[in-house]
């Protein structure tokens, strides 16, 4: 009974152990004979049971730890795929730290006689900076993989590197750790020495059937760092090349002691400063680099001090921009560096120009698309030109040439003066003479031949707009005189009068005069008579007498309609001139005078009478007289102001008044008291009617 109870009490022990097993390790326990099942059921009274249980849990823990490298490898792969959110160096440190703790825990369980405190399992932070990260590998961590599998794995990883895929080996650092079989040899080679292996600073430590290789690049490799690789050769096989790995030092830092890998530092060493200058404080590395190159070029050529940084950030004054625009285009297009002519071609005072150029560059270098000497040299050239002009103005020495624009107006806007243009050299004047710019006027201010041709073309174009359409505002003709009554004549006389009127119209339709020059500035030489004649011709060109609807040539009788005096011919009336009025412009008076001068040949030029064909015996002009008896017509003011708007306003007022009267009359019906009263009244009446109908039935 006691033994049975004792066995019954010890049966739940294995179940508890099996409950702690992980499900993915059951198959490995069932298949492998290396780990026998727990013997608590078969040998409950064995004295070596605690030791076996300890070994069992130790091996189980080693199996669990054997899966950690692959898990960390996958984690590193995903971290690199997602932009390096988790730094790989800290993951390596965490892996080594966890493995070291696990190994020390296994040693404590395998040797229970050795007592270690819990504090010994902690990894001091001060020791991490001194102890190498390879010490935990010397404790004998057994990787559950064969040498052939490891070699295939390395080859696969190196092939993945060729396709630029992010793998575990692709870590941007100048140091690393590799686990290789003992049959392989490792060496660091550069991209220049891929054919012959060169032994680099390697640290090889044997660990059973494997070798732990920790490599650290020499500073000498930094001179040709574009490509560094790891080459593994077989000692027996003929040196089969596995592959190489590209290492970029931009995101890592090599410790100066050259012994142990160190974490990244914010500051940089002096050697790294020489190879890669820091970014500009202005935040633009390209501009800083260009400025440094420019200053080095100036220092090498001129031998002066480096100028101070540009304070205006590349902007220059308007005068310097004008100097750039006024440079000789041939020198700028051929060679910008040779924009300044040699000293032999210039006058003697220009020999000191290089020194001035250097001083200007050292004080305020300007950033432009050309070299920095160009604007300064041009400015000095202009200053020297002005100085020579001032000093040699009274002497017969040749004046230094100043680059000017071919267009005089643009050159004047850019700062040139007429005196500078007159004082230009002979070569420059010959250039102006070879290709003169036709501005439309000769030297004497008269019109040139090209301008005359253009005027003829413009006149032809203007005449094309004049049509016979009487309703065209540009073709409206009307005389500036009143119509006169003409005595009846023979058809021949009427024909002559009509031809005379047509002659006047034809003379008015003459070609447009040539417009005088208003921009030449010689207003004092103009004659007023010639100007008036030209203006009169121009005014008459717009007046076409054959168009009765032309506002500029309107004709109307100046006297009221009256009885036609027939059968009377007054010789004095024929000599009377038609009444011509002058408008608000002087041109109208000129027109009227010309028409009055033609009155003898054409006494009746009225278009309306000519078209109607009416003939009158004589022409009589009525005078305005005042009668003593005047007929007055009285019109009521109210009737005069009547209109539709007044009717509408009156109707609106009436409608508003009616609305107000209606509201006063029936507005109380809409009140609540009245409605309630009427409701009660109707309800009582409805009840009475209902009772009356029931009684009647």
From Swiss-Prot:
GO terms for molecular function: protein phosphatase regulator activity. Residues 345-354 have a biased composition (Basic and acidic residues). Pfam families: CReP_N, PP1c_bdg. The modification Phosphoserine is found at residues 197, 199, 492. Keywords: Phosphoprotein, Translation regulation. Residues 328-354, 417-456, 486-531 are annotated as: Disordered. One of its GO terms (biological process) is ER overload response. GO terms for cellular component: protein phosphatase type 1 complex. InterPro entries: PPP1R15 (IPR051254), Prot_Pase1_reg-su15A/B_C (IPR019523), Prot_Pase1_reg-su15B_N (IPR019512). Disruption phenotype: Mice are born at the expected Mendelian ratio, but exhibit severe growth retardation and impaired erythropoiesis. None survive the first day of postnatal life. PPP1R15A-PPP1R15B double-knockout embryos do not develop past the preimplantation period. The keyword Phosphoprotein applies. The keyword Repeat does not apply. Maintains low levels of EIF2S1 phosphorylation in unstressed cells by promoting its dephosphorylation by PP1. Interacts with PP1. Part of a complex containing PPP1R15B, PP1 and NCK1/2. Belongs to the PPP1R15 family. This is Protein phosphatase 1 regulatory subunit 15B. It comes from Mus musculus. The gene is Ppp1r15b.
